[in-house]
Amino acid sequence: MGCRPRGPRGQAERAGSRCQYHWPMTNRSRSFNVPDKPSLDGIEAKWVDVWDESGVYHFDRSKSREEIFAIDTPPPTVSGSLHIGHVFSYTHTDTVARFQRMNGKSVFYPMGWDDNGLPTERRVQNYYGVRCDPSIPYDPDFTPPEKPDPKNQVPISRRNFIELCERLTVEDEKVFESIWRRLGLSVDWRYTYATIDDKSRAVAQRAFLRNLARGEAYMAEAPTLWDVTFRTAVAQAELEDRERPGAYHKVAFHRDGGDPIIIATTRPELLPACVALVAHPDDERYQSLFGTTVRSPLFGVEVPVVAHRLADPEKGTGIAMICTFGDVTDVTWWRELKLPTRAIIGWDGRIVADPPEGLDSEEGRAAYAKLAGATVHTARQRIVEMLRESGDLIGEPEKITHPVKFFEKGDKPLEIVTTRQWYIRNGGRDPELREALLKRGQELDWYPEHMRTRFEHWVGGLNGDWLISRQRFFGVPFPVWYPLDDKGNPIYDSPILPDESQLPVDPSSQAPEGYTEDQRGKPGGFIGDPDVMDTWATSSLTPQIAGGWESDPDLFERVFPMDLRPQGQDIIRTWLFSTVVRSHFEHDCLPWKKAAISGWILDPDRKKMSKSKGNVVTPLSMLEKYSSDAVRYWAASGRLGTDTALDEKQMKIGRRLAIKILNASKFALSVAGEDTVADPAAVTEPLDRSMLAVLAEVVQDATAAFHEYDHTRALERTERFFWNLCDDYLELVKARAYDPESREGASARAALLIALSVLHRLFAPFLPFVTEEVWSWWQDGSVHVAKWPSVEEFRAAAEAGDPAVLAATSEVLHTVRKAKSEAKLSMRAEVERVTVHGKQAEQARLCRDDLAAAGRVTTLVFETTDDAELRVDVELAPAEK
């Protein structure tokens, strides 16, 4: 299904950039500039500067949509430092960007910073030792404490707090960018955005206003998941279960003329909030109670006994109390059974001072007074003791461990309080919309495919709409004001909205049209909506922000829908799903064609690495110790969707590989010389053609792997061939290649240059620095805009070759080397006689001279038999006496 653009369209200035594609297989004369002692030292800074100056990674927006590959780059959260997990997943994306660029695509590869929201606020609070208090007036001369104390934070105005957030995020972003550049990300930094900048705020506010106009966004006063530490609402997607100790308390409810009814609860402090008891309609034990009432202990409130299918006969005593609100099941029961509300927990997580409606008895109010003002934990302790004294606690609490819901960034269990919030419909209460969004998930190409299931499970399990408002400070404000009646009360049903041309707006500091600032907060005047958008409400619009939706229609038409969304598996339910929702509403299509999902980085104990767990490793030390290419090698060795351990051994291997590329390239170029032409027609020898035949298979496999978003397979295949080339082929042809006069020598030299050019380009997406360095020794331009290798470049020579020739010849050479090694002889030691037996002996015979020279063999005998296994007998030369 195509996208349907909404809203006005205009003209935008078109800015193009140079993008060259270089064919290395030419007959041009050239000079080599090979250093005497190649080294990795200094090449990163050197090439980062060159790439910046040349604009080699600039997006060419003059290209048509078919010629563009657009990436919806994840904007990392700017709240401290990057960790090695970021390097892991962003390297995956960069290999794709580089491959597509070498395939002739103009790559739209922007970078964003997710710099608004709670993580930034927490960092600012701890870094400067401050906290936001909106009741404090702005101080234009405020300076943060010289010695910040996170435990004794200085209260400051909202405006002062936001200024500190802006100041610190700018500094953090500079550090992030320097690390990304050092890693070699081929980002076009001209297209950088921040989720709190004016462009992002305008996009977020515009999308919200359109959602509101179409009925996709709405305000409701309802039970809300609430973090009492941060005093903000929390969405379903931000929850996590944590195992916590608790206890089942058996509590007696009383009824006239009958035995008490025993319920079991982990939250006895909610007894004053009890509005009913509930059991399963098929539970025979409680059939006679349905439709009757019982009295709550201590408080004496009459509550009905009701039936509902969600009651679990196997849990506790099979009958439970419904409180407003202990958990989301309470909310479901309250809503479906149309029960009253008796809220007792405030926004601060303490028991509110006034007893709830219905608690009328003197004894009940006296009992409640003992709880008022207490934290939930303290109230629980007090009420258990009160129940014990009254005889309504049956037995002692039974200790258990059970899952408790937390805000993913919070330290205390969530509560449910009634608040007024903004929501966007997401299918949680609309089966038709749910099916439409599930269909979007089916339209999307997932890499790996099994990640689709996580999306479907999340959408299928939604139990409410997406809560997008937050009671915080540093975020995108809702573009809404409310008129005040003659008593100064907000008229929420008649919001005042800005025109899109006025965006972005800040209702906390700007007056709406038709009002003046001195009418703020006064009867007959107005107030601004005090809340900000959840950070995902902005991040869900990254394709629109980066692509210039409405602000740059020409660019947007060229990049949207984007080609790829790369991201982590843990934010499928948040970032990926929310972006699908916004695009479905605004454009009636997916925001991208493909999703590439990275796995997690694990610490040495195989635990997920995360800032909250304190087990993260920052990348800078690894980059300095091993080099950027080495760290990229480790990252690229991890497949999409697969959890990967931080492994410095892999980085050491990557560094060794980069050094080997330097040295092998120097050797090959010194052997080939400047007069050699990389001409496939000059490749005439069986071993050379065989090597190119194997290389052709590598090119085909690596190319197919990249098209399937399997960068690891492309790297493994390329690396395996490279080491075989260095260990076997180079040794086999070394003597012949040094012969300047013979056709056989020219064949080896031409084959070497062809292989070198192809390998440099195959390695380029993974090891950008070392490949650019060696490419510059003998080629014009950048390897990163050179054409991705194709078998067509050397097809004639490859098709004339038999891969079995190189395999058989290499095996013979391995056996000869092994014999020398076991005899503790130098590899230059003479060999008297080598006899080769088996079906492959004939292939090895074709390379007799190369084998004799490489193995220093005096006599070579080939005996072709029907044996499938190649057998090699080695007779070493007699030791000198």
UniProtKB/Swiss-Prot annotation:
UniProt motif 'KMSKS' region: location: 608-612
Motif 'HIGH' region: positions: 76-86
First-level EC class: ligase
Record's catalysed reaction(s): tRNA(Val) + L-valine + ATP = L-valyl-tRNA(Val) + AMP + diphosphate
GO MF, one example: aminoacyl-tRNA deacylase activity
Classification via PROSITE patterns: AA_TRNA_LIGASE_I
Record's GO cellular component terms: cytosol
Keywords: Aminoacyl-tRNA synthetase, ATP-binding, Cytoplasm, Ligase, Nucleotide-binding, Protein biosynthesis
Chain residues that bind ATP: 611
Pfam families the record matches: Anticodon_1, tRNA-synt_1
Main location class: cytoplasm
GO annotation (BP), single: valyl-tRNA aminoacylation
HAMAP family in UniProt: Val_tRNA_synth_type2
Family under the similarity heading: Belongs to the class-I aminoacyl-tRNA synthetase family. ValS type 2 subfamily.
Subunit structure: Monomer.
The protein's name: Valine--tRNA ligase
